[in-house]
Amino acid sequence: MVPEAVDAVVNELAGISDIFNIALDEDQTYVEVIDQAIDEQYLAAMKTVTVDPELVAKEGQSLKFVYSPLHGTGQYIGEKALQQAGFTNYTIVKEQAVIDGDFPTVAKPNPEDAAALEMAIAYAKETGADAVVATDPDADRMGAAVRLADGTFQVLTGNQIAAVLVNYLLTAKQNTGTLPDNGAIVTSIVSSRFASKIAESFGVTTADVLTGFKSVSYTHLTLPTICSV
C-alpha cells in the first residue's frame, strides 16, 4: 500500500474501540466484478504506448519467438496484446499453456530462472526462433532468452532486460522527437545502475522507488513535474 492508503487504514483502525461491535455493511455495491470490458480497456491503452508503431508494423512479423505463460494467466491477455501490436510470428509452449497451480513442468515458475525456460528454449531451437519470452503465473513479471551467433541461447537477467528496454524506449523517443526535456525513468531500489547510466546519457533522470508496481505507478503523484518515459 502507498503512504496515503496506509494512513487512511490506520486512521480508521484508530477510531475502533471494540472490534466486536463493528457495524457490518452488507451493501454489495462495494464489490465490482472485473470482466472482459476491463481487458478491452487495457488492450486499448496498450495501443497508445507503442513508441514507434511504423517500425513494429514493418518488422514485427519478422521477429520469430517462443512464448510461455508458465501455467499461468499470461496467455489470455498476452496473445491478444501481441497480435494487436503486430507480433504474430510466435509459438506457444503447449505444455505450459495449461493453467495449473502445481506447475508440473518446472521446479519453480520463475521466468528469470534458466531452468524454467528450458522447455521454451527447446521449442525455440526446434522452430528456429530468435528469442524466448515467458511470464510468471500471474503475469506481472517476465523473463527472456535470446539466440546467440553460435545458435545457443542466453538467458537475460532482469537488469539486462531493463537496460535493453530503456535504451530502446529512449532511442525511439529521441528519433521520433517525443523525448521530453524533463524526462525520467523509474526503477526500484534493488535494480542495478545499468539502466540509470543509459538514461543519464540521454539527459534523462532516474527516480528510485521501493519495489512493486504500486510504488512505480505512485510516482505520477510524487513527481508531478517529471514526465516518466
Where are these regions (language model features)?
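Glycine-rich phosphate-binding loop plus the immediately following alpha-helix
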Residues: 1-19, 158-182, 187-195
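Glycine-rich active-site loop/lid that clamps phosphate-bearing ligands
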Residues: 198-218
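Conserved small/polar residues in nucleotide/adenosyl-binding loops
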Residues: 219-225
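Short acidic, glycine/serine/threonine-rich loops at helix termini
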Residues: 76-81, 102-105, 142-148, 168, ...
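Phosphate/diphosphate-binding loops
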Residues: 111-134, 193, 208-214
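Gly/Ser/Thr-enriched, mixed-charge loops and adjacent short helices
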Residues: 1-116, 124
